[in-house]
Amino acid sequence: MKFRFGEGAEGTLNTSVTTAMIDQEKRAADLKRRKNQMLLFGGATLATLASCRLTARGISSRRYIPKMFQANHMPPQSDMVKEAAMAVVFATTMALSSFSMVVFGVAWSQDVTSLKQFALKMKTKLGAQQIEDEIRNAPMTPETQDLQDQLAGALKKD
């Protein structure tokens, strides 16, 4: 197949044109992934704002404000089990939405797409990879070698 624009010596597409097309596809995929991460972070932020607003409304509606000539040292009777359950619900929704906002925000800002990639980035940033390599390459003590040989022998007998 011959092309007029971008022809090489044999009449095929020039490699720079195909490389540019591949780069453009990578950029489009990267843009789509970043947009998805942004939308996840935005959704988690909206969930956090909604849960905070509901919690504030729930707290303010339960406040006891006595009217004139009412005793302010004896609030009206209420169902303590219901109050405790609502407190747990409010705290849980706020904690989960805040945690999800932090997770999606870090993933978006650090360009993390999977848990495996997150683990690798954290290992490199915290220096755990060097420590693992040192431990892996450390010489084995005679006691450890003897124990390893005994365990290997016991497992071979079975």
From Swiss-Prot:
Disordered, as annotated region: 136-158
Signal peptide: none
Membrane topology: Multi-pass membrane protein
Keywords annotated in UniProt: Membrane, Transmembrane, Transmembrane helix
Residues spanning the membrane: 38-60, 84-106
Disulfide bond sites: none
One GO location term (cellular component): membrane
Location relative to the cell: Membrane
Main subcellular location: membrane
Domain of life per record: Eukaryota
Family per similarity comment: Belongs to the AIM11 family.
PANTHER family given in the database record: ALTERED INHERITANCE OF MITOCHONDRIA PROTEIN 11
Protein name: Altered inheritance of mitochondria protein 11
Lineage of producing organism: Eukaryota, Fungi, Dikarya, Ascomycota, Saccharomycotina
Gene: AIM11
